[in-house]
Amino acid sequence: MYDSIIDPTLGPAADSERGPMVLAGRPENLSGLRLGLLANTKRNAEQFLDEVGKLLVDQHGVTAVLARKKPDITNTAPEPILDDLRAGCDIVVVGVGDCGSCSASAVADGIILEQSDIPAAVVCTDAFTASADAMARVRGVPGYPYLAVPHPMANLTPEGVRDKATAAVPGIVAMLTGRAMAAAS
């Protein structure tokens, strides 16, 4: 009667044929690299990423920053935005996942960039790790690493955003350079 049952939580059928995804290679440090910032439309996402960008320039020698904003929180970044990041960046910080939909799409964006051999550090708040983890599984990358910061982000004052960015930078650097992945192994 039926040929097969499709379980959408397992991801595309091709995933089992492709094998596990390999993350992009990681640099030893960020000095001289071009940084991409991919923000969604959540309140404080751009401000958080701008603060992260300033800190990475000042403290880690990033030489250029290319900021892009997605038109919505529920979908992955459109190809023209991804093309800009692929062409102009060596590393990308994606965020901020501060709700279920935007956490899932942030992880999907990170995986897409990794598939283009661009190291990505995805930032989500800790209240939405279930959504982020589910998207990683659907995309065929269970256990995809991302940085979970304390929730919430959207209602923070400018000072609170700066403080959260300052606290997040060591984890972002560890993710971009591979130190976080090595520690998890």
Residue ranges and their predicted role:
Residues E28, L33, L37-K54, T63:
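Glycine-rich phosphate/diphosphate-binding loop of Rossmann-like nucleotide-binding domains
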Residues M1-A24:
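N-terminal amphipathic/basic leader segments beginning at the initiator methionine
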Residues D58-P71, G143-P150:
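Short beta-strand elements in bilobed, periplasmic/extracellular small-molecule ligand-binding domains
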Residues V107, I111, Q115, A130-V141:
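Active-site-proximal loop->helix
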Residues V149-A184:
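A charged, well-structured terminal subsegment
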Residues E79-D90, D109:
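Short, well-structured alpha-helical segments in soluble
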Residues D72-D83, V161-R162:
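Structural motif
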